[in-house]
Amino acid sequence: MEFRGDANQRIARISAHLTPQMEAKNSVIGRENCRAKGGNPGFKVAILGAAGGIGQSLSLLMKMNPLVSLLHLYDVVNAPGVTADVSHMDTGAVVRGFLGAKQLEDALTGMDLVIIPAGIPRKPGMTRDDLFKINAGIVKTLCEGVAKCCPNAIVNLISNPVNSTVPIAAEVFKKAGTYDPKKLLGVTTLDVARANTFVAEVLGLDPREVDVPVVGGHAGVTILPLLSQVKPPSSFTPQEIEYLTNRIQNGGTEVVEAKAGAGSATLSMAYAAAKFADACLRGLRGDANVVECSFVASQVTELAFFATKVRLGRTGAEEVYQLGPLNEYERIGLEKAKDELAGSIQKGVEFIRK
């Protein structure tokens, strides 16, 4: 019967990710021993909110990333189902699922990169600030877990409103004594993706050939595309500038309204989050000249946080770039963005300090 025992052990080992909470603590087939053979060495990544609208697609995309060796999927509901589904993909990353607050610490321990899309989505008529009351508490709890279990991890924060949740995360980490401003990155990549796409449509180019810096924040007028700095260099009429700026700023609303109550920009956001996460992993690997836009602690303006291009490296955002020359339209837009951002940042700070 030794053969049957070996077979049962193999079955338990490969299925441990489906119900990790049921693994015996003294088992020789614990989670740390569950590794696919032949996988390339890589980074350990956790997605918090993996069963949500963004999280499911993001889990799929991160499972496909060759730089990921271990992928932890956490949520308060439905995490086992998403984990089982994604784990059947024949890519190198080993997947583990974690369900509920009691398993948050296990999900986070030892992670190199933590991606947080957790929270409620936007619905028709809602602004990102309408999400604040619920999502602020979620981000606080999750970041407390990060501070305790993987204080050196790079954090990619997606949960809206990013203009407030990034300051919330910073205050949580400061309280815990683990704050490293280079490692807290608000994900604004979707604004850049939209800008590249919409500008490419106007210019008749492939979006992959276009690069539009988008600075400021991640909501409404705080989203400021710098069309004067588009690559390849291009000129636009005043009407085109107005059209492009408004469409980029309201891209999220465009999707929410088009889905008519059935969701928000989950697919494009997952794509953008995966793209930014890949950039962070390439930075961690030591690749040179990895540059993306992100909402980070900044001295570019008088505000504590601001989205600009950053150079990503082994320690996170290793360099924050200046804005560069702005035209009159952009200078006016910058002042509007800063006025709005100041209140959003303060709102996040006060949520923790109150």
Swiss-Prot record:
Belongs to the LDH/MDH superfamily. MDH type 1 family. Catalyzes a reversible NAD-dependent dehydrogenase reaction involved in central metabolism and redox homeostasis between organelle compartments. Peroxisomal NAD-dependent malate dehydrogenase involved in fatty acid beta-oxidation. Reoxidizes NADH from the beta-oxidation and provides NAD for the conversion of fatty acyl-CoA to acetyl-CoA. Does not participate directly in the glyoxylate cycle. Required for maintenance of photosynthetic rates under photorespiratory conditions, and carbon flow during photorespiration. The keyword NAD applies. The active site is at H218. The gene is PMDH2. This is Malate dehydrogenase 2, peroxisomal. InterPro entries: L-lactate/malate_DH, Lactate/malate_DH_C, Lactate/malate_DH_N, Lactate_DH/Glyco_Ohase_4_C, Malate_DH_AS, Malate_DH_type1, NAD(P)-bd_dom_sf. It is an enzyme of class 1 (oxidoreductase). Expressed in rosette leaves. Its main location: other. It comes from Arabidopsis thaliana. Its EC number is 1.1.1.37. GO terms for molecular function: L-malate dehydrogenase (NAD+) activity.
